[in-house]
């Protein structure tokens, strides 16, 4: 560049902060920057070699006009300081006078101006801006940025109906939700956050892909610091040793394998759409301090389970990252523990725990030795798996649990913090007497055995068959199980808890209740086991096979009384469930009688007791204070479902006894009949679905306790309100624990502690029954009934609408009706206050709560959130490809693939087609030329042939000509075949034969002449031509014969 064109001013601007020297300073300063680029020369002054180099350049850059001062100042690249006050790198850049792009090197700026702003004959310049391009395709692509709507390219076939247009860039979409996600690109909103790596996404599809890819499932610390709530597994308890023989069950893998728990968030911050995940303490009965680590998709609460109750009773909720779900699943451990305590005759499990703590007699127990239960408060939950999403879309959460000592249970309202997720394998609650697999299938029970005898979570899980040996050793058939007195304080030591639990039983001697609970669990799993299964059960329980067989027969015949608080026979187990009444937990004494019924779904007998006062333990809010009173949870198995009832009047009277017992009706419980005791439980026959916990929105003072799964689950919500976890009916309005399961899937558990914030877990079937317990002092509450019957939920905002469509083909009870409109014709979400105009919108919205994609492919069972996605997916199975490119003819089954192709086709689509056509044309032309030359050479007389030209022929050329001749012959044969179809095949063949004979004779003559004249390559050429003609003649003859 000529020196005179460079600015004369050599001033170097200080620190780039004063750039007001305009273009002159800019250019000169850049020359300096060019030389200062390398680290070694950072501090050197201006190098004159640069000027010399610029003067030697052949191409001079002519600037139409000098850049304006204010233009330079106004560009963000030219001015600016970083947040620390130091001039940032951009402030040191040289900006282009035409487009304000910044460059650190002057040479880079020169190149930019040359290639983008210098116009010449070879360049393609944009008519709307100063950009120039070397290739037309680049210009065409660039021109799209000036178009008002890029959808112009899409206006082909189905592209003309894009009615949702972006106001920012003009891009249009066929569906509103596509525009919604597109707008996030402009706004910068990224509502989807990966719970593992904290990466955020604006599109749900990107989020789902990221989660499915499992690229960030490791528990690596973020920014060098371990994430709170995601600390590496720690097994503080000395007895908590990793047992190599207890690998995580395969059920935990699927999509959520190795996903660590997310930091707990409070219920009121859980939204229907992805939100910032933060710590969200949930108001719960004082929970047990469980530092629970999660590894391999399993939440292990066996870590430090301490019975210390927090004065506030605030429990950290466990947030399980939802696999592909928008919002995480928040599980209140204290709620779940309450449920689990009662689940298998919670007392039995507790007793098992006691026994385990007292003496780890069974090998399995020792292997699973997840101690920390000994720390005063035994955590019921030793491990929680992340939600497992099956192929059919059903979701299940597997809970490995062990019940606490009665005192702890009563103190369940202890501070339950899930802060240190530890690997499940290494940290398990010491006494995992039962592996609780929450399943909703008829043959699946809480034993945690999918197969009937295997633990879903661990192979060595003490639960199921493994847990039984411990009990069997201490089995005392004649020792009646007596409800333990409630432990007044959470801090009560285990020993006292265990003794209290079982009345007179010593911790080393499990009461009959334990065995009964285990037997019931087996019964719930399989009501009619074969001889082999019976023998396994007998071995695990350490009872004679005849005894076990007779017990099963009696259960099937309904001879075993469903409910005696302390039946000598294996009928009942008392469970103390602490109700969270303010700071004092209310122990719930629940006795679960054995199932009475010939069928595996024998009705559950409920002891009816005085109605529970709404005021005391029912208040969902943490504030309700009531003296701790044991909840008597006696549950009997109903013919088709279980109900959990809590008897409120037992060991320590409450302000009013919390009576959650259901009437003893074996056959009627399944019917949607009002239950005389506390609540009207809408009961519908349910296949045995273990622990199907329906989520109900309830006012703070509502309480209900019904369980509709095989195992009786009576839960007192952490909010001191009993949680109704009856699958058959959910009558309660409890804001706490919600476990919903699809008919044939394991229900997921989620605890909700906010009064009107019920969050359901994925793949749940929601149905509601409008039954209000007459005893309820509060206004009638609309009850949510899992699996099937729809009820209006009591929500101040609107009448709840339950969409059966959201259910996963609920096989159990048929839903009464599908989504129901509210009074004003709108569709209201039963899980939040949102209202929608269309049922399809509600279905999609439900996905935010449940993770259940409403539209499922009938062939591969893949589910989609939007119906049109399913429609396009089905084309993969049908092979339909309705979208076609008008340039290259390529077809597409998905509109997205087609749109992407159309958007970028100008860079390759047309060229590919042209290249393909050009190549074909060239080949055809080459073939024709070769044939013409060949025929001409064959027909030419030897005398006319130039000897020099013949000498120039090489063998390779002859071979090439032969190949071309063969190709030509092939083409001719194809033409002949077509002509034969027209009836002219024979005559033409004869003519060709004659011509070829003549050609052959000429070839022979030419060969002889060539041999006489030359003895080099020419004779070979003649012979090759002769052979070629002969071969072609033979081929034509064969073709004729075939014709």
Curated annotation (Swiss-Prot):
Pfam families to which the protein is assigned, alphabetical: zf-C2H2, zf-Di19
Gene Ontology CC: cytosol; nucleoplasm; nucleus
Post-translational modification: Ubiquitinated, leading to degradation in a proteasome-dependent manner. Deubiquitinated by USP51, leading to stabilization.
GO terms, molecular function: chromatin binding; DNA-binding transcription repressor activity, RNA polymerase II-specific; E-box binding; zinc ion binding
Covalent link (Glycyl lysine isopeptide (Lys-Gly) (interchain with G-Cter in SUMO)) residue numbers: 271, 697
Residues with PTM Phosphothreonine: 625
Taxonomic superkingdom: Eukaryota
Residues where Phosphoserine is found: 237, 246, 602, 609, 616, 623
SUPFAM superfamilies in the cross-refs: beta-beta-alpha zinc fingers (SSF57667), Homeodomain-like (SSF46689)
Zinc fingers classed as C2H2-type: ranges: 94-117, 124-146, 164-186, 192-216, 827-849, 855-877, 883-904
Cell compartments where the protein resides: Nucleus
Chain residues forming the annotated DNA-binding region: 504-563
UniProt keyword annotation of Transcription regulation present: yes
Compositionally biased intervals (Low complexity): 236-246, 1023-1034
Region spans: Disordered: 1-62, 222-251, 419-444, 469-512, 557-632, 779-821, 937-1043
Biased composition (Basic and acidic residues): 17-30, 428-444, 470-479
Bias type Acidic residues, positions: 31-42, 956-978, 987-998
Functional summary from the UniProt entry: Acts as a transcriptional repressor. Binds to E-box sequences in the immunoglobulin heavy chain enhancer as well as in the regulatory regions of many other tissue-specific genes. Represses E-cadherin promoter and induces an epithelial-mesenchymal transition (EMT) by recruiting SMARCA4/BRG1. Represses BCL6 transcription in the presence of the corepressor CTBP1. Positively regulates neuronal differentiation. Represses RCOR1 transcription activation during neurogenesis. Represses transcription by binding to the E box (5'-CANNTG-3').
Membership in a protein family: Belongs to the delta-EF1/ZFH-1 C2H2-type zinc-finger family.
The protein's name: Zinc finger E-box-binding homeobox 1
Organism of this sequence: Mesocricetus auratus (Golden hamster)
Gene encoding the protein: ZEB1
